[in-house]
Amino acid sequence: MTGWLSPDEWTAVALSLKVALWATAVSLPFGVLTAWALARWRFPGRQILNGLVHLPLILPPVVTGFLLLRTFGRRGIIGQWLDQVGIVFAFNWTGAALAAGVMAFPLMVRAIRLSIEAVDPRLEQAAATLGASKPWVFLTVTLPLILPGLIAGAVLAFAKAMGEFGATITFVSSIPGQTQTLPSAIYAFLQVPGGGAGAARLVWVAIAIAMTALVLSEWLSQAVARRMRGA
């Protein structure tokens, strides 16, 4: 199996997994908070927040990548200040994780929000009347009930992050060994004569990773559902 892919191809696969995992893990707490706010809170600007969250799904990925570059690039609005403390996103794998997280965030929020909206608010209110604080109500009542949706949202975000191309290549380019992820490596193969075989190998790897993630998500969701029914 090791000889099936070249060292550069393995590097692209490993980098994609690293980027997708970091993008999912870092964005998950923000995804839960945003989904909770959109599902349970009523506040001025709620629809604006909802629109901003889903904007990456509507904008061309290249536009999102350009906005990230103008914001978090070394001369960007925020990036120039981060650069002074040694935090660099542009043309770095961390920037690839940021771009992947931004593009995957809407899918994560939507899945978690639907799960929260499916929870009967009276269950949360009953716990609150017994003296439980809002964080404790969330941890002991809401979170167990939305766990299947949370898992689904995380897997959707991971899959989207694994396949992210447009925003990533615009923001961090495609530097072999540094920012060249699986999709950008496939694209690079397709730009050279005779690169179809290498692209095909990486396509099969991408399919295998996606199927593994989906099967694992389904298994975890069913395991959680069985445990809840047993409880």
Placement of each model-derived feature along the sequence:
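Periplasmic/extracellular loop-to-transmembrane helix junction in inner-membrane transport proteins
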Residues: 1-25, 37-46, 188-197
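Interhelical loop and adjacent transmembrane-helix boundary motif
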Residues: 1-8, 171-211, 216-219
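Membrane-interfacial helix termini and adjacent extracytoplasmic/periplasmic loops
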Residues: 2, 65-101, 171-175
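Hydrophobic positions within alpha-helical transmembrane segments of bacterial inner-membrane proteins
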Residues: 20, 24-32, 36, 62, ...
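Transmembrane-helix boundary motif in ABC transporter permease subunits
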Residues: 22-53, 66-68, 81, 115-117, ...
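Transmembrane alpha-helices
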Residues: 25, 109-112, 116, 120, ...
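C-terminal transmembrane helix and the adjacent membrane-cytosol boundary/short C-terminal tail
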Residues: 45, 106, 110-124, 128-129, ...
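Non-cytoplasmic
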Residues: 73-74, 150-188
